[in-house]
């Protein structure tokens, strides 16, 4: 029997952000304001709030912004020496650490309403399915290249991923939100995804991947679909009855139905849109004036220390 989810989880591995990913935002101020809005909106619906981060993340989000997470873990200190191009490691470690049903939110996701019961009661859930074309060099997902790069150098891939690619499956799952009630399956998925990144046999192969930061989406989102559909196809698998529910049925619905559902995700270029940045700033200044001022004070403090 499933439980009603009370736990909202965020993760922040500071190393990839410091190296590259901060450039994804209109400004550092708007990145921080997004954290404020994501946290404050979600905790109205999911009161047990958890942050999985490292020491630098604590200094920024807890000491700096004053976000009042119920639980803070510095589990991601374990990634200090890891390759920051595999930015998704922070999320995968956070998924693996959970010991009760949860929803993990990216910090650019804002929940204006509770997630529907059909979603939060599911064994596993994600934001929406994504599809791509095999052989498209501009696609976010290039599983045939990923497999060839690893297998040609005697690397290691889990059975789920090898099978899914061999079947030419072209479905992934967007993980702007991710979570569920079947923790055994989620732990298996997250731990196996981490093994793909950390397996000693893959170290040589990864030197030949041209964009590991993009392949991170494959390891998280394509492999999630691979895990679901592989085990559904194996009658003897303990996970054969695990299904996944998506908040939106299609990528397009995530835009056209977002207001109705009460969900905002600042995907991709939206983070650098000046009009959206202005709306974000005005919303936080209006709804959370103390947090807004705390953000400005923190930015001043960082600037003075530079």
PLM regions and their residue ranges:
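A glycosyltransferase accessory/donor-loop signature
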Residues: 1-5, 11-12, 165-169, 187-306
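A conserved donor-nucleotide-binding helix/loop in the catalytic core
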Residues: 30-32, 37-38, 76-105, 109-112
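Short, polar loop motifs at secondary-structure junctions
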Residues: 53-59, 107-113, 242-244
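Active-site regions of enzymes building and remodeling cell-envelope glycoconjugates
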Residues: 64-78, 101-102, 118-127, 261-264
